[in-house]
Amino acid sequence: MITIHLYYTGSNGGARAFAEKMVKSGVAAAIRAEDGNLRYEYFFPLEDPETVLLIDQWRDQAAIDAHHASPMMAQIAALREKYDLHMRVERFVSDDSGLPEKDLKFIKR
């Protein structure tokens, strides 16, 4: 499993407007329906009103490659340009071992 954190930063509320447009236009729902997509959610940092965090999770690199080759990417690129967003990306590959036993004591279930 591959998890991508995309930090979209803009000005004058552009990042939030971008995320809202992605949801209202149905693009976010279409991405969630793509084969191999496991998660696609936007979050808003309390201390940075001009940034939006997208957590995007995929089964494998092939699913990401198919997503990047889809016609949807042109829509996303156009919206990024419209709102003049800049991005920072973090990529995580899961090791599937779960949390170590010693860390579980800090987790309330």
Give the residues covered by each predicted segment.
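Short S/T/G/P-rich N-terminal loop/turn motif that feeds into the first structured element of a domain
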Residues: 1-52, 57-69, 81, 85-109
